[in-house]
């Protein structure tokens, strides 16, 4: 569903990517900053119960996920290493979101059911990524599924 917006989103992100490249910021730096920011925001905001502010702050850092690849392509440096780094750090960002939500629901006054659901979302999110990576490492195409990463995080 959200994949339909990719072309339009690229037009929005191009000027930002160009500005960062002019400032000599590398795609890997953008990847790291985005991940560290998303992890910190998720682990600070969600356990504190900032369930409206937290997603906005986390989303600001997750936007870097579309910037780093854009920047690498503009530099002609789109590489397997960059792809590996990006997808690996994405898992840390995703995990922090679910851990932050689980910590919130583990607090007083909440049902453990919600904590369990956040933990299940973490497990299934990691499993989805692992299954795709493993299939691709075996030469299989693994493009199927009901939701992309962006859609899984949105839900």
Where are these regions (language model features)?
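Lipid-exposed faces of alpha-helical membrane segments in multi-pass integral membrane proteins
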Residues: 33-40, 56-60, 64, 99, ...
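Short glycine- and Lys/Arg-enriched binding-loop motifs that mark or flank ligand-binding interfaces
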Residues: 30, 50, 65, 78, ...
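Topogenic membrane-insertion module of multi-pass membrane proteins
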Residues: 1-56
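Acidic (Asp/Glu-rich) catalytic motifs at the cytosolic membrane interface
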Residues: 53-99, 127, 131-136
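A feature for the membrane-embedded catalytic helix bundles of lipid/isoprenoid biosynthetic enzymes
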Residues: 1-17, 88-155
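Alpha-helical transmembrane segments of multi-pass membrane proteins, especially transporters
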Residues: 27-31, 57-61, 87, 117, ...
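Membrane-interfacial loop-to-transmembrane-helix junctions in polytopic alpha-helical membrane proteins
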Residues: 23-26, 46, 50, 75-78, ...
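Membrane-helix exit/interface motif
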Residues: 44-48, 67-71, 100-107
């Amino acid at each position: 569903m959200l994949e339909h917006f990719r072309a339009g989103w690229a037009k929005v992100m191009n000027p930002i990517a160009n500005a960062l490249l002019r400032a000599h910021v590398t795609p890997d730096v953008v990847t790291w900053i985005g991940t560290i920011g998303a992890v910190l925001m998720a682990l600070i905001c969600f356990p504190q119960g900032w369930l409206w502010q937290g997603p906005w702050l986390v989303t600001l850092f997750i936007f870097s996920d579309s910037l780093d690849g854009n920047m690498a392509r503009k530099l002609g440096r789109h590489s397997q290493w960059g792809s590996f780094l990006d997808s690996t750090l994405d898992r840390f960002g995703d995990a922090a979101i679910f851990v932050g939500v689980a910590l919130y629901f583990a607090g007083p006054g909440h049902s453990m059911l919600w904590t369990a659901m956040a933990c299940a979302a973490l497990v299934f999110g990691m499993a989805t990524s692992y299954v795709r990576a493993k299939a691709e490492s075996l030469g299989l195409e693994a493009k199927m599924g009901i939701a992309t990463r962006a859609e899984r995080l949105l839900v």
